[in-house]
Structure formats: C-alpha cells, structure tokens
C-alpha cells in the first residue's frame, strides 16, 4: 500500500507547544532546572534533527550538557546506515545502565532511523529496559507529547509505527555556534539502491513548501 506524505497542521504543532509548556511548568513547580544531553550519530540530516530536538527541549525549559552523568534527560539520536554507528549506540546504551542506577529519575531516549528498525526497537524493549522512550524520525515533531507521556505515566513509550511520511515546518531549533546551519529542504529518497536502507526508513522524497519561513535559514547566517 502506498504511503502518503502528510503536512503537519499548525494546530497539531500548537498542541506540541502546549506539551512543552506542561513540561516546563512541571519542572518549575519542582523548583528544578532540567538538563539534557543530546548525542547525535550519523549524517547532516541527523545533526539538523538533533538541533530540532534541542529547540523543543529549550522551549520546555531545558539547558544542555555533553556529559550524560549530569543530565536529567539523555537522547541518543541514531543513524541506521553504518554498522559502526549502530554498535556505538548499543555500547552507549550499556554505559547508560550505570548512569540510570545512579540517577533513577533520569529519562533515556532512543530516536532516529535506528529506532525505526523493528529488530532494534524489539531488542531495546527486551534487553535495554532502562530506555524510557523510543521513536522513529516520522514522530520527531511529536517529541514534546511523547516526552510528556513518559513524565506523566512513568511508563515506557514506543512510537515506531510505520506511519505516512510527515512534513513538519516551524519546529524550533538550537544551532551550534559558528557559521554553518543545517537546513533540511527535502527528506527521503525514491531510489531503492540495493546497498541503502534510507528509503525504507525515510520513505519517498518530500520537500518543504515553497516560500515559507523555513527557507529563511539560507539568508540568516550571522558572523
């Protein structure tokens, strides 16, 4: 069955901002200052997705660290193209077992293309029970809602359904310092090369709409 490309509505994105506000209010009520560690593996697309995750977290009241031991939330933003990157992710998940024991309230998240693989999500579900949240690239725009579910229910959340391809514009980003900014203008691929798994995870090609604020990234480099 052919899967359709779906443009995420403004109302749906506004709902995610409501979940960001809920998370921020929760930590404010606890007089806590949440810290997140976002560890990105793989290509420039993953770097761009990592900056979106950080943008949504910043709007939820988080600051950032590179040390998972200091973090209340650890995100492994994964790549499924190279086996070496996959092995590193599982190695890091093993290490995070110890940080979770030291800080039982820490939330650990696995996302990206690797998380979309059924064998990986099943392995995590069975063997890495300290991982709280797993979601694929199509659910990235719903990250605030998924994270809120974890905080509210204290149960593990898996969002790796083989959904239609989504196009979500206007997601906040936190960019690293410097003169480079990754702006995704298209997703997916229509060429099913025998050696590549990208079309199976990111689905068919879909592009940003013309003349939107998303393109402003090309004109806003600051020196």
Per-range role (PLM):
Residues 1-223:
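Proteins enriched for Cys/Gly/acidic motifs involved in redox and nucleic-acid/cofactor modification
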């Amino acid at each position: 069955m052919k899967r359709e490309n779906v443009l995420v509505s403004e109302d749906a994105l506004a709902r995610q901002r409501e979940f960001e506000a809920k998370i921020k209010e929760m930590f404010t009520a606890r007089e806590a200052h949440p810290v997140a560690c976002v560890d990105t593996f793989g290509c420039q697309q993953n770097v761009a997705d990592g900056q979106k995750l950080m943008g949504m977290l910043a709007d939820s009241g988080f600051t950032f660290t590179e040390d998972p031991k200091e973090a209340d939330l650890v995100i492994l933003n994964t790549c499924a193209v190279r086996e070496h990157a996959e092995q590193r992710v599982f190695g890091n998940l093993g290490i995070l077992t110890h940080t979770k024991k030291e800080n039982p309230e820490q939330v650990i998240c696995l996302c990206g293309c690797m998380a979309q693989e059924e064998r990986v999500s099943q392995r995590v579900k069975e063997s890495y029970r300290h991982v709280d949240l797993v979601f694929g690239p199509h659910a990235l725009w719903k990250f605030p809602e998924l994270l809120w579910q974890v905080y509210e229910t204290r149960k593990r959340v898996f969002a790796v359904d083989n959904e239609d391809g989504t196009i979500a514009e206007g997601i906040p980003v936190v960019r690293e310092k410097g003169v480079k900014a990754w702006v995704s203008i298209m997703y997916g691929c229509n060429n099913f090369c025998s050696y590549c798994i990208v079309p199976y995870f990111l689905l068919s090609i879909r592009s940003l709409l013309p003349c939107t604020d998303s393109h402003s990234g090309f004109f806003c480099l600051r020196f």
